Amino acid sequence: MASTTPTPPSTSETAREFFGLVWPGKEAARAAASAPLTQRFKRDSALSTACNTDNAIIAADNLPVLQELAARREVFDVIYIDPPYNTGKDFVYRDNYRLRRQMRSGSYAEWHSEWLSMMLPRLILAREVLSPEGFIFVSIGEDEVANTRKVLDEVFGEGCFAGQLIWKKAGTGKNDAKYAVVEHE
């Protein structure tokens, strides 16, 4: 007669099982947060005239900026980022982090992995420069809102989520549309 007592999983089996967002390239993206500083930024005097303040608005690729701010041990109370929404549309900046069509296998992880790999080191560094009482605001569209929330929860902790602000898009369809209409972002 067979035993009805379940066999506990081996240590190696439980070590491989965990809950979290996983994608190809995640460990390399995590390592990018601690990569050596490759460029520096400087204050734009034309944009900084009549500014006798410690506050700053920095408009740049935020990865090298965050690397430098973290290296300087700078701390901020508010961080606002507006990353690419990964819509594939043509903008001044790259907004298509999807793998090339011939590389797609249709799996969810591969579809979004490049975008997630772009975001992770930036959020890790943002966490380093955010004060303990600080807030980070992230503008993101519907294409990556779920992934953004998962990565933010991983980096900052689920308990740090304060809320989601929604704004109504201009120019959305009427209520009599044939299909569901996305009215917010």
Q: For the regions a protein language model found, what residue spans apply to each?
A:
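Short secondary-structure boundary/capping segments
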Residues: 73-75, 93-99, 151-157, 179-183
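Short, solvent-exposed loop/turn and secondary-structure capping segments
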Residues: 88-96, 148-150, 164, 176
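A generic secondary-structure signal marking the coil-to-beta-strand transition
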Residues: 54-56, 163, 185
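Polar, glycine-rich mid-to-C-terminal structural blocks
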Residues: 170-171, 177-185
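A general structural signal for short secondary-structure junctions and capping/turn motifs
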Residues: 48-49, 128, 178-181
